[in-house]
Amino acid sequence: MRFKGLDLNLLVALDALMIERNLTAAARSINLSQPAMSAAVRRLRSYFRDELFTMRGREFVPTPRAEDLAPAIREALQHIRLNIIPWDKFTPDQSDRHFRVSLCDFVTVVLFQKILERLAREAPGISFDLLPLTDNPDELLRRGDVDFLISPPLFMSSAHPKIDLFQERLTCVGCSNNKQLEEALTAEEYSSMGHAVVRFGRTQQPTIEDCFLQEHGLKRRVEVVVSSFSMIPAALMGTDRIATVPLRLVGLFEDTIPLRMTAPPIALPTFTEAVQWPVLHDKDPANIWMRDIMVQEAARLP
């Protein structure tokens, strides 16, 4: 089919090349022969009057023009797949569906580990990419690059549906021999101590505790920034640093790592972890089933 002189099948080829960055792999992913894919590249170059890709070894490197085109093409194809083409029947125990989930390691060990255990029994063909949180999760959802985002709703866009999963609260931890934690911390002590903090993405986006502390006028003297909660203990051991982290996470750490816990100097509010999915996936039977599993397992958390 042509639209204003463009064979729309070529957009599928361009999208595959943007994903795979390799001619053979892209051809295989959309069931084309390599000669047919090469012909598609020639036609794309002719239509857009741009090279679109340059070769670096066997890798196809997109030009700026291809980078500009890719998001709109991906979104258009996603819309067709999810809203025009009929949904396939979804049978969990027979499915080989692959889900991409953006989340932090705290949610991985507290919640998603239980989901993985359950699905290994009930739907063993289901697979996952568990991806770190990024600077712009809304863009990932809009393009359909992830199936789910799990984070506090504060950091979610209003453009996509979401549902709450569980509540969590924050506590302070330090090395077990940190003498300053033998008594309750004052606000002044908390502010003057060295802190280890978690930041997400290349631009080190703030976390929920940053927002709470800012609301209460508390500042931290940050000495160490890490990219995941699992790195916090290493930043605390043998020092007088402290960290403000989710309480359930401390419960997992304390079985193997000598930490001391104390309450923050002010009563920080609880926060919510929610799951969000692309609006285009809202009626996808597999997506509906997966988010139901998440809600069920979250309800079982202690």
Swiss-Prot record:
**What positions does the domain HTH lysR-type occupy?**
6-63
Please provide the record's keywords in A-Z order.
Answer: Activator, DNA-binding, Nodulation, Plasmid, Repressor, Transcription, Transcription regulation
Q: Which PROSITE patterns match?
A: HTH_LYSR (PS50931)
Q: Which GO terms describe its molecular function?
A: DNA binding; DNA-binding transcription factor activity
Ranges of the DNA-binding region feature: 23-42
- Family designation: Belongs to the LysR transcriptional regulatory family.
What is the role of the protein in this entry?
NodD regulates the expression of the nodABCFE genes which encode other nodulation proteins. NodD is also a negative regulator of its own expression. Binds flavonoids as inducers.
The molecule here is called Nodulation protein D 3
The major lineage groups are:
Bacteria, Pseudomonadati, Pseudomonadota, Alphaproteobacteria, Hyphomicrobiales
The gene is nodD3
